[in-house]
Design a protein with these regions (language model features):
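C-terminal cap of thioredoxin/glutaredoxin-like
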Residues: 6-10, 16-30, 34, 115-214
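Structural alpha/beta surface segment adjacent to cysteine/selenocysteine redox centers
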Residues: 18-120
Length: 214
Protein backbone atom coordinates (compact mmCIF):
# COMPACT_ATOMS: atom_id res chain seq x y z
CA UNK A 1 0.00 0.00 0.00
CA UNK A 2 1.17 3.51 -0.80
CA UNK A 3 0.25 5.95 1.97
CA UNK A 4 0.58 9.72 1.68
CA UNK A 5 0.96 11.48 5.00
CA UNK A 6 0.07 15.18 4.89
CA UNK A 7 1.36 16.87 8.01
CA UNK A 8 3.48 19.58 9.56
CA UNK A 9 6.48 19.32 11.86
CA UNK A 10 5.03 22.08 14.08
CA UNK A 11 1.56 20.51 14.35
CA UNK A 12 1.05 19.05 17.84
CA UNK A 13 -1.38 16.33 16.74
CA UNK A 14 1.14 15.24 14.08
CA UNK A 15 3.70 14.92 16.87
CA UNK A 16 1.16 12.89 18.83
CA UNK A 17 0.65 10.65 15.80
CA UNK A 18 4.32 9.56 15.67
CA UNK A 19 3.94 6.44 17.83
CA UNK A 20 0.87 4.96 16.08
CA UNK A 21 2.43 5.57 12.67
CA UNK A 22 5.79 4.16 13.76
CA UNK A 23 4.03 1.04 15.04
CA UNK A 24 2.20 0.67 11.72
CA UNK A 25 5.43 1.06 9.74
CA UNK A 26 7.12 -1.56 11.93
CA UNK A 27 4.24 -4.02 11.50
CA UNK A 28 2.01 -3.06 8.53
CA UNK A 29 0.09 -6.40 8.46
CA UNK A 30 -2.62 -6.15 5.75
CA UNK A 31 -1.08 -2.92 4.46
CA UNK A 32 2.23 -4.62 3.58
CA UNK A 33 4.28 -3.77 1.65
CA UNK A 34 3.79 -0.24 2.98
CA UNK A 35 5.36 2.83 1.38
CA UNK A 36 5.00 6.18 3.16
CA UNK A 37 5.30 9.49 1.33
CA UNK A 38 5.47 12.73 3.34
CA UNK A 39 3.81 15.90 2.05
CA UNK A 40 4.12 19.14 4.00
CA UNK A 41 0.68 20.66 4.50
CA UNK A 42 1.67 24.13 5.67
CA UNK A 43 0.17 24.82 9.10
CA UNK A 44 1.13 28.47 9.58
CA UNK A 45 3.66 29.26 6.85
CA UNK A 46 5.05 32.78 6.48
CA UNK A 47 3.66 34.04 9.79
CA UNK A 48 5.46 37.27 10.73
CA UNK A 49 3.81 38.39 13.99
CA UNK A 50 5.42 37.23 17.25
CA UNK A 51 3.18 35.04 19.39
CA UNK A 52 1.69 36.68 22.49
CA UNK A 53 2.30 35.17 25.95
CA UNK A 54 -1.46 34.58 26.27
CA UNK A 55 -1.58 32.66 23.00
CA UNK A 56 1.52 30.69 23.99
CA UNK A 57 -0.21 29.61 27.21
CA UNK A 58 -3.34 28.63 25.24
CA UNK A 59 -1.30 26.44 22.90
CA UNK A 60 0.50 24.76 25.80
CA UNK A 61 -2.93 23.94 27.24
CA UNK A 62 -3.78 22.36 23.90
CA UNK A 63 -0.54 20.39 24.02
CA UNK A 64 -1.67 18.84 27.32
CA UNK A 65 -4.57 17.23 25.46
CA UNK A 66 -2.19 15.83 22.85
CA UNK A 67 0.08 14.49 25.61
CA UNK A 68 -2.87 12.77 27.32
CA UNK A 69 -4.07 11.18 24.08
CA UNK A 70 -0.67 10.12 22.77
CA UNK A 71 1.71 9.77 25.72
CA UNK A 72 4.25 11.95 23.92
CA UNK A 73 6.56 14.13 26.07
CA UNK A 74 6.19 17.92 25.99
CA UNK A 75 8.25 20.71 27.53
CA UNK A 76 6.33 22.59 30.21
CA UNK A 77 5.77 26.34 30.19
CA UNK A 78 7.67 28.62 30.41
CA UNK A 79 10.48 26.52 28.89
CA UNK A 80 8.77 25.99 25.55
CA UNK A 81 10.00 27.59 22.33
CA UNK A 82 6.66 29.42 22.30
CA UNK A 83 7.69 31.35 25.41
CA UNK A 84 11.08 32.47 24.07
CA UNK A 85 11.13 36.26 23.50
CA UNK A 86 9.85 37.29 20.07
CA UNK A 87 9.00 33.74 18.93
CA UNK A 88 7.25 33.76 15.54
CA UNK A 89 5.22 30.62 14.79
CA UNK A 90 6.29 30.35 11.15
CA UNK A 91 6.07 26.72 10.05
CA UNK A 92 7.67 27.23 6.62
CA UNK A 93 11.33 26.72 7.66
CA UNK A 94 10.69 23.33 9.33
CA UNK A 95 8.60 22.27 6.33
CA UNK A 96 11.37 23.40 3.94
CA UNK A 97 13.97 21.54 6.00
CA UNK A 98 11.90 18.36 5.73
CA UNK A 99 11.49 18.85 1.97
CA UNK A 100 15.26 19.37 1.73
CA UNK A 101 15.97 16.06 3.45
CA UNK A 102 13.28 14.34 1.37
CA UNK A 103 14.93 15.64 -1.81
CA UNK A 104 18.55 14.82 -0.92
CA UNK A 105 18.33 11.93 1.56
CA UNK A 106 14.83 10.42 1.15
CA UNK A 107 15.62 7.39 3.30
CA UNK A 108 16.09 9.73 6.29
CA UNK A 109 13.05 11.99 5.83
CA UNK A 110 10.71 10.28 8.31
CA UNK A 111 13.43 10.23 11.00
CA UNK A 112 14.22 13.87 10.29
CA UNK A 113 10.55 14.92 10.51
CA UNK A 114 10.18 13.09 13.85
CA UNK A 115 13.40 14.53 15.25
CA UNK A 116 12.38 18.10 14.39
CA UNK A 117 9.08 17.48 16.17
CA UNK A 118 10.86 16.13 19.24
CA UNK A 119 13.26 19.10 19.25
CA UNK A 120 10.32 21.54 19.21
CA UNK A 121 7.84 19.85 21.53
CA UNK A 122 9.99 17.83 23.93
CA UNK A 123 13.24 19.82 24.00
CA UNK A 124 11.77 23.32 23.62
CA UNK A 125 14.05 24.24 20.72
CA UNK A 126 13.12 26.94 18.21
CA UNK A 127 12.82 24.97 14.97
CA UNK A 128 12.03 28.09 12.96
CA UNK A 129 15.78 28.83 13.11
CA UNK A 130 17.96 27.47 10.27
CA UNK A 131 20.80 26.65 12.69
CA UNK A 132 18.53 24.45 14.81
CA UNK A 133 17.23 22.67 11.70
CA UNK A 134 20.84 22.11 10.60
CA UNK A 135 21.64 20.77 14.09
CA UNK A 136 18.93 18.15 13.63
CA UNK A 137 20.32 17.16 10.23
CA UNK A 138 23.79 16.82 11.73
CA UNK A 139 22.37 14.80 14.64
CA UNK A 140 21.16 12.24 12.08
CA UNK A 141 24.57 12.09 10.41
CA UNK A 142 23.66 14.27 7.42
CA UNK A 143 26.28 16.74 6.12
CA UNK A 144 25.49 20.10 7.72
CA UNK A 145 26.95 22.32 5.00
CA UNK A 146 25.20 20.46 2.18
CA UNK A 147 21.93 20.60 4.09
CA UNK A 148 22.33 24.32 4.83
CA UNK A 149 23.12 25.24 1.25
CA UNK A 150 20.16 23.29 -0.14
CA UNK A 151 17.81 24.55 2.61
CA UNK A 152 18.59 28.17 1.66
CA UNK A 153 18.07 27.57 -2.07
CA UNK A 154 15.19 28.89 -4.15
CA UNK A 155 14.63 25.35 -5.42
CA UNK A 156 13.71 24.10 -1.93
CA UNK A 157 11.51 27.14 -1.31
CA UNK A 158 9.65 26.34 -4.54
CA UNK A 159 9.35 22.63 -3.75
CA UNK A 160 7.94 23.48 -0.31
CA UNK A 161 5.35 25.79 -1.84
CA UNK A 162 4.44 23.00 -4.23
CA UNK A 163 3.75 20.74 -1.24
CA UNK A 164 1.49 23.38 0.33
CA UNK A 165 -0.38 23.81 -2.97
CA UNK A 166 -0.71 20.04 -3.41
CA UNK A 167 -2.23 19.72 0.05
CA UNK A 168 -4.71 22.51 -0.71
CA UNK A 169 -5.64 20.99 -4.07
CA UNK A 170 -6.49 17.72 -2.32
CA UNK A 171 -8.79 19.64 0.01
CA UNK A 172 -6.86 18.71 3.15
CA UNK A 173 -8.35 20.68 6.05
CA UNK A 174 -6.43 19.37 9.04
CA UNK A 175 -3.32 17.47 10.03
CA UNK A 176 -2.37 14.72 10.22
CA UNK A 177 -4.17 13.39 7.14
CA UNK A 178 -3.54 9.95 5.65
CA UNK A 179 -4.38 9.25 2.02
CA UNK A 180 -4.13 5.87 0.28
CA UNK A 181 -2.81 6.04 -3.26
CA UNK A 182 -3.90 3.46 -5.81
CA UNK A 183 -2.70 4.24 -9.32
CA UNK A 184 -4.19 7.63 -10.20
CA UNK A 185 -6.81 7.40 -7.45
CA UNK A 186 -6.55 8.86 -3.96
CA UNK A 187 -8.70 7.76 -1.03
CA UNK A 188 -8.93 9.41 2.37
CA UNK A 189 -7.97 6.95 5.11
CA UNK A 190 -8.33 9.36 8.00
CA UNK A 191 -7.85 12.92 9.18
CA UNK A 192 -6.77 13.86 12.68
CA UNK A 193 -5.02 11.90 15.40
CA UNK A 194 -5.73 8.17 15.49
CA UNK A 195 -4.49 5.68 18.06
CA UNK A 196 -3.02 2.50 16.57
CA UNK A 197 -6.18 0.31 16.85
CA UNK A 198 -8.26 2.97 15.07
CA UNK A 199 -5.57 3.42 12.44
CA UNK A 200 -5.42 -0.32 11.73
CA UNK A 201 -9.23 -0.45 11.57
CA UNK A 202 -9.33 2.40 9.01
CA UNK A 203 -6.70 0.71 6.86
CA UNK A 204 -8.45 -2.67 7.11
CA UNK A 205 -11.74 -1.08 6.01
CA UNK A 206 -10.05 0.59 3.07
CA UNK A 207 -8.17 -2.58 2.09
CA UNK A 208 -11.36 -4.65 2.31
CA UNK A 209 -13.38 -2.17 0.23
CA UNK A 210 -10.56 -1.93 -2.28
CA UNK A 211 -10.29 -5.74 -2.60
CA UNK A 212 -14.04 -6.04 -3.19
CA UNK A 213 -13.86 -3.39 -5.89
CA UNK A 214 -11.42 -5.54 -7.89
Amino acid sequence: MNLIYVGDAMCSWCYGFVQPLDALLADPREAAPLQLALVMGGLRPFTTEPITPTRADELVGYWHRVAEASGQPFTAAPKTALHSPGFVYDTEPAARATVTVRSLWPQHVWRYFKTVQHAFYAAGRNVTEPEVLADVAEQLGLPRSEFGKAFASQEMRDLTLRDFEQSQSWGVRGFPTLIAEEGDHLHLVGSGFMALPALRERLALWTSAHDHAH
